[in-house]
A protein has these predicted regions:
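Short alpha-helical transmembrane segments in multi-pass integral membrane proteins
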Residues: 1-25, 86-151, 195-251, 307-372, ...
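Residue-level signal for short hydrophobic patches within transmembrane helices
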Residues: 14, 18-37, 41, 67-74, ...
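Transmembrane helical elements of multi-pass membrane transporters/channels
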Residues: 23-42, 46, 147, 181, ...
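Helix-terminus/linker motif at the lipid-water interface of multi-pass membrane proteins
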Residues: 33, 37-59, 128-135, 191-198, ...
């Protein structure tokens, strides 16, 4: 199914940068967008094939988005730590470190996935209760979450495997495999819901099965490849030193990614208090607006990986050039995505739910959230730049204060006196602008390209 032909790695250390960044970033963005589309198919299918209960089914899936994002984003950040460690080792031409980091990453993913699956089953009900999920939505939301959590081992394994490939500059292999598993996901969604007349349990099972397929296919590629990232069954063990390096970079990055979900859990709780229509509208809009974030975040990932390899090779000036180009090219790509989404927003919302009230409320969210994407693009690229140097903790702390702190304060202090959907959504531009300013100040004060100029050894 997947050819084992040799794919030439993207040379991040030599030649022009501007034309290579899109070659790395756009497949990453396409992978994330396809992943969102396939995830959105859960909502689209239950919203169109579950009859009179469609609004409850859509709200049930949407009610879990913040919890699932919290878990997945945390470990995607840790996987990014693995990406940086491997990229830096490639830049240093340290084959032994690359091998140890790859095998350690695989074990981290499997063990973490099992742990999350077990712990998640125990706390699923209290979590949904804390989110104030309405009584008519709660049973379906709980069923969806519990089935989804069973798939955490394969979901996390795929994300770590994708990070391993991206550390070499290969962003196309994860894209191809995700496309295969994603098409399977859509077909299974339709089969379970439209044919077998299942509800949220059908789309949850389809998600688990398709993620299992993607993780198995990527693992097969890692076993068969002759590149530095080759996986040998006999070498699958955790190297403590490498584990420490991955966690030192990845855990703060994971916390930074999870901050979105933590803050959004608080926001989701406020949204839930406004009723089922607002819940359904917000859920549908989120699945559209995230496309713009996927575009800007792909350039942040490119920034991290390019800087990681060049820092390992001691090419500090090239690292600074990477940051500037990522901001410029990321801004152009993000602006194009925003315009396209706003022009087609109402039509896209109708795919999830054709209720006119849901579409109107959902479009309001699109306008307000997308207006803040410029701030997201700036702070994500600056954070990605610093992560490439292994400088991850302080940006994570600042992001926690800027996003999580501001949004929680907004919901606790401002929302009670302005209990409208717009009152909730204003938290997005406020928190993101504050965070962009704080991250810029960190970059100016710590200046990692100078701070690490003479310290380009092991991270």
């Amino acid at each position: 199914m997947i050819e084992n032909r040799k794919r030439k790695p993207l040379d991040m250390l030599h030649g022009s940068i501007w034309n290579k960044l899109p070659l790395f970033a756009l497949p990453v963005a396409a992978t994330a967008i396809l992943e969102q589309l396939f995830n959105a198919s859960d909502i689209a299918v239950v919203g169109n094939f579950t009859g009179a209960g469609k609004t409850i089914a859509v709200a049930a899936v949407g009610a879990n988005s913040s919890i699932i994002s919290l878990i997945v984003n945390l470990f995607v950040g840790i996987a990014l730590g693995a990406n940086v460690v491997i990229a830096n080792a490639i830049g240093r031409k340290d084959k032994d470190a690359v091998t140890k980091a790859v095998h350690t990453s695989i074990i981290i993913a499997i063990l973490a996935g099992i742990g999350v699956a077990i712990a998640g089953e125990l706390v699923a009900k209290p979590l949904l209760s804390a989110l104030q999920v309405p009584g008519d939505v709660f049973p379906e939301a709980l069923l969806y979450l519990r089935i989804y959590l069973i798939g955490m081992p394969v979901i996390l394994l795929y994300n770590f495997e994708a990070a391993i490939f991206r550390s070499t500059g290969d962003t196309k292999t994860p894209l191809v495999i995700l496309t295969i598993s994603g098409i399977l996901n859509v077909l299974l969604n339709l089969f379970f819901v439209a044919v077998l007349h299942m509800t949220v349990n059908g789309v949850a099972i389809a998600t688990v099965v398709s993620n299992a397929v993607s993780s198995i296919l990527l693992f097969y590629r890692l076993v068969k490849t002759k590149e530095l990232i080759h996986v040998d069954w006999k070498k699958l063990r955790i190297d403590r030193k490498i584990l420490g390096q991955i966690m030192r970079i990845g855990l703060p990055a994971g916390i930074q990614s999870a901050v979105f979900a933590v803050a959004n859990i608080v926001i989701q709780s406020a949204i839930n208090s406004l009723g089922t229509v607002v819940m359904a509208a917000s859920s549908a809009a989120y699945n559209i607006e995230i496309f713009a974030y996927d575009i800007l975040n792909s350039f942040s990932q490119a920034c991290t990986t390019f800087v990681g390899q060049n820092y390992g090779a001691g090419q500090i000036k090239r690292c600074r050039k990477v940051l500037i180009l990522c901001i410029v090219e990321g801004a152009i790509a993000t602006a194009c995505a925003i315009v396209l989404i706003l022009l087609t927003g109402k039509a896209l919302l109708s795919i999830f739910n054709n209720d006119s009230q849901v579409i109107s409320v959902g479009y309001t969210r699109l306008i307000m959230v997308l207006s803040a994407c410029t701030f997201s693009m700036l702070y994500e690229n600056m954070s990605g730049y610093m992560r490439g140097f292994g400088f991850s903790l302080i940006p994570a702390i600042v992001t926690t204060l800027g996003i999580c702190g501001v949004r929680i304060f907004w919901i606790m202090a401002v929302f009670p006196s302005h209990k409208t959907f717009a009152g909730i959504l204003t938290a997005y531009p406020v928190s993101l602008s504050v965070t962009a300013l704080l991250i810029f100040l960190v970059l100016v004060i710590y200046h990692p390209s100078k701070r690490f100029q003479t310290d380009k050894g092991e991270m």
